[in-house]
From Swiss-Prot:
Binding locations of substrate: 149
Family classification: Belongs to the archaeal SPP-like hydrolase family.
Annotated InterPro entries: HAD-like_sf, HAD_sf, PGPase
EC number annotated for this UniProt entry: 3.1.3.18
Any one Gene Ontology cellular component term annotated for this protein: cytosol
Protein name: Phosphoglycolate phosphatase 1
Main enzyme class: hydrolase
Catalysed reaction, written as an equation: 2-phosphoglycolate + H2O = glycolate + phosphate
Residue positions of the active site: 8
Length: 228
């Protein structure tokens, strides 16, 4: 039985992958889950202040994971990754002629840069320094993080006292692959990256936030074999 749904933010809860506007159908879907007794958590690469604000104003109850797994919140804040030295941030940005994302000012462990394209040279640079590097499609992220979103989701499930089999997740990006590794039922929205669709248990016909609504409607109607 599903007791928790983990929802990515950009490209999943929003109207589409190019928008920062939260989809109203997705908000309605969250309310339907909560009314049925299923908790909802956000899992995102966004910074802690962004997730904390959304968590409060969307009136969520299942905690959240920020900075691609590096920050977890449930009743209190937990830092799962070592903080990044500013000298490394500056070196990476300067060497590859990148720009800070606007959220870097508020980040602690996982930093994002644009353009969002990763090169072999970037991968080698990160590997030499034992850094995680990945593109979300919105930015290139670097952090002292061995497991991406998985490290934060593991902690959150521990805090909530839930097993992998109790949890479903919905996302759109290759950064959600690590998220999918920690849940029992995996959903990719219709406009998700192909590599995420390849491992999904269900792919919505609708994109982004409308896909969230589609999944929730089917879940609550009991249309997925083996889960309720």
């Amino acid at each position: 039985m599903i007791k928790l749904v983990l929802v990515d933010l950009d490209g999943t809860l929003t109207e589409d992958r190019e928008s920062t506007r939260i989809d109203l159908d997705a908000i309605y879907a969250i309310r339907l889950l909560q009314k049925s007794g299923i908790k909802v958590s956000l899992v995102s690469g966004n910074s802690y202040p962004i997730l904390r604000g959304l968590y409060t104003y969307l009136y969520l109850d299942g905690g959240f994971v920020a900075e691609n797994g590096c920050i977890v919140f449930y009743k209190e804040k937990y830092r799962m990754c070592r903080q990044m030295e500013q000298s490394l941030v500056d070196e990476f940005k300067s060497l590859f002629k990148l720009r800070d994302t606007w959220q870097n000012e508020y980040r602690e462990c996982d930093f994002g840069f644009v353009p969002a394209k990763i090169t072999d040279e970037m991968i080698n640079w990160a590997k030499e320094r034992n850094l995680y590097i990945k593109s979300s499609g919105y930015a290139v992220h670097i952090a002292y993080n061995p497991a991406g979103k998985r490290i934060g989701v593991e902690k959150l499930l521990q805090l909530l006292g839930l097993k992998k089999e109790d949890v479903a997740a919905i996302g759109d990006s290759s950064t959600d692959i690590e998220l999918f590794q920690q849940v029992g039922f995996k959903v990719a929205v219709g406009n998700a990256d192909d590599e995420l669709k390849d491992i999904a248990d269900y792919i919505t016909s609708n994109k982004s936030g409308k896909g969230v609504r589609e999944f929730v409607d089917k879940l609550l109607k009991g249309e997925f074999d083996g889960i309720k």
